[in-house]
């Protein structure tokens, strides 16, 4: 996407309009500056605190400055039964936020309590400094790290035989691609046994506009030019939006086949809303998975907007009910 495209939004300075949607400045060389410090929350592992969820950070790859933030519901300390494990990837268009960002920290705390799960939220490398597939590589490294971890929270309270890969927005894209990769090497991840994927408003795109993208081209949160820029900054240099990282339905078969997910018996939950410009692509992916024989649970709500659950507590609670049922049903399914 060119600077001229950005200027069509009504200003000679493309960043004037861009800052309305993303806290970044686009530099002439197509790098970005993040001028605003996004609120973050420190981990709190103290069991004597009043918090219903304990949290702590563990280094994943010091060379990449990546880490995993664990979320442990306090009630797990007093129960003998282990809880399902959710490996979570935050959103942010591949270019913003971290596992410590307050908006995702708070969401994971609520999810841990209401869904009754242990969460390992992965802090992955961001684009454009680290373009895709860097985040996918970090995701796989996290799964391997969890498999081999001797951390007492994971070994004592997380049920490795009931693991789920989940992500929101760009994180949903990461969860999808990490899931395809993990399915291809499932035996190597044992005793970590994945039961399903949770794709929460997963971020996908394509060169040809869908009906929802056209209908919501001037969306107040994710207008077309912002989505295009996110992909320009995140995809490998020279790739277009029909690259498999962006458009999972562009080719007849992905690099890592759906067939393995089906044969492993994994279930896939796809969640979205019709106020999201990417809803058509999310629905198309769910349909394609179903046609491949994958057990899909799809929930597409009327109205709403992208990332509504991060801002609306009632929407979040409704989602946690659906998520908990998906997790419980998946855990009782024999693979």
From Swiss-Prot:
InterPro entries: AB_hydrolase_3, AB_hydrolase_fold, Carboxylest/Gibb_receptor, Lipase_GDXG_HIS_AS. Paraoxon binds at residues 92-93, 169-170. It holds the Pfam family Abhydrolase_3. Is inhibited by the organophosphates paraoxon and dimethylchlorophosphate (DMCP). It is an enzyme of class 3 (hydrolase). Keywords: Hydrolase, Serine esterase. The active site is at residues 169, 276, 306. One of its GO terms (molecular function) is carboxylesterase activity. It comes from the Eukaryota. Belongs to the 'GDXG' lipolytic enzyme family. Carboxylesterase acting on esters with varying acyl chain length. This is Carboxylesterase 1. It comes from Actinidia eriantha (Velvet vine).
């Amino acid at each position: 996407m060119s600077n001229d495209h950005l200027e069509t939004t009504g200003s000679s300075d493309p960043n004037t309009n861009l800052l309305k949607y993303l806290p970044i400045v686009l530099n002439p060389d197509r790098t970005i500056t993040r001028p605003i410090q996004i609120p973050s929350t420190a981990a709190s592992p103290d069991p004597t605190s009043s918090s219903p969820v304990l949290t702590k950070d563990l280094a994943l790859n010091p060379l990449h400055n990546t880490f995993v933030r664990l979320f442990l519901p306090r009630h797990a300390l007093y129960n003998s039964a282990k809880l399902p494990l959710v490996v979570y990837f935050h959103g942010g268009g591949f270019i913003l936020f971290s596992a410590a960002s307050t908006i995702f920290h708070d969401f994971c705390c609520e999810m841990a309590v209401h869904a009754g799960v242990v969460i390992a939220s992965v802090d992955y490398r961001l684009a454009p400094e680290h373009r895709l597939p860097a985040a996918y590589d970090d995701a796989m490294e996290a799964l391997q790290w969890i498999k081999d971890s001797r951390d007492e929270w994971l070994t004592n309270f997380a049920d490795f035989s009931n693991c789920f890969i989940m992500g929101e927005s760009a994180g949903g894209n990461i969860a999808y691609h990490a899931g395809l990769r993990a399915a291809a090497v499932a035996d190597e991840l044992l005793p970590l046994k994945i039961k399903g994927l949770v794709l929460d408003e997963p971020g996908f795109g394509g060169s040809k506009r869908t009906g929802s993208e056209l209908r919501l081209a001037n969306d107040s949160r994710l207008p077309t030019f912002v989505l295009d820029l996110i992909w320009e900054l995140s995809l490998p240099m020279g790739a277009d939006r029909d690259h498999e990282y962006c458009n999972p339905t562009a080719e007849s078969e992905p690099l890592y086949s759906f067939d393995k997910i089906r044969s492993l018996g994994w279930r896939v939950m796809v969640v979205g809303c019709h106020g999201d410009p990417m809803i058509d692509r999310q629905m198309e992916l769910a349909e394609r998975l179903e046609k491949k024989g994958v057990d899909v649970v799809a929930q597409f709500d009327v109205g709403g907007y992208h990332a509504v659950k991060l801002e609306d507590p009632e929407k979040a609670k409704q989602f946690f009910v659906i998520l908990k049922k998906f997790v419980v049903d998946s855990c009782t399914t024999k693979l």
